[in-house]
Swiss-Prot record:
<feature type="propeptide">
    <location>
        <begin position="22"/>
        <end position="74"/>
    </location>
</feature>
<dbReference type="InterPro" id="IPR012627">
    <property type="entry name" value="Toxin_22"/>
</dbReference>
<comment type="function">
    <text>Probable ion channel inhibitor.</text>
</comment>
<keyword id="KW-0800">Toxin</keyword>
<keyword id="KW-0732">Signal</keyword>
<keyword id="KW-1015">Disulfide bond</keyword>
<keyword id="KW-0964">Secreted</keyword>
<keyword id="KW-0960">Knottin</keyword>
<dbReference type="Pfam" id="PF08092">
    <property type="entry name" value="Toxin_22"/>
</dbReference>
<feature type="compositionally biased region" description="Basic and acidic residues">
    <location>
        <begin position="60"/>
        <end position="69"/>
    </location>
</feature>
<feature type="region of interest" description="Disordered">
    <location>
        <begin position="60"/>
        <end position="83"/>
    </location>
</feature>
<dbReference type="GO" id="GO:0019871">
    <property type="term" value="F:sodium channel inhibitor activity"/>
</dbReference>
<dbReference type="GO" id="GO:0090729">
    <property type="term" value="F:toxin activity"/>
</dbReference>
<keyword id="KW-0872">Ion channel impairing toxin</keyword>
<comment type="similarity">
    <text>Belongs to the neurotoxin 14 (magi-1) family. 01 (HNTX-16) subfamily.</text>
</comment>
<feature type="signal peptide">
    <location>
        <begin position="1"/>
        <end position="21"/>
    </location>
</feature>
<feature type="disulfide bond">
    <location>
        <begin position="82"/>
        <end position="95"/>
    </location>
</feature>
Length: 113
């Protein structure tokens, strides 16, 4: 029975002493992996930033294309109310105050020149 105890004690001491060495090695491995992980995170962050910049450039390009292809604002036809400060009467028409007496919805209308 003493031999079993001595053998068990010997195995226990060896396991503890070797386990501590493994613990130091594990700590060093973890530090290396952490440093590698940080460089990986920096790489991933830069890659994501590049993709976002490309996407932003595409979106801005699409916006500029839409503004180039969009229609001009429609003009106002004859006899239609217009704004004195911002007349949008079609070519050949002028925004004037009506000559007839009466109650009008707006005080200016598009008339021929």
């Amino acid at each position: 029975m003493n031999t079993v105890r001595v053998t068990f004690l010997l195995v226990f001491v060896l396991a503890v002493s070797l386990g501590q060495a493994d613990k130091d090695e594990n700590r060093m491995e973890m530090q290396e992996k952490t440093e590698q992980g940080n460089s990986y995170l920096d790489f991933a962050e830069n890659l994501l930033l590049q993709k976002l910049e490309e996407l932003e450039a595409k979106l801005l390009e699409e916006d500029s294309e839409e503004s180039r292809n969009s229609r001009q604002k429609r003009c106002i036809g004859e006899g239609v109310p217009c704004d004195e400060n911002d007349p949008r009467c079609c070519s050949g028409l002028v925004c004037l105050k009506p000559t007839l007496h009466g109650i009008w919805y707006k005080s200016y209308y598009c008339y021929k020149k």
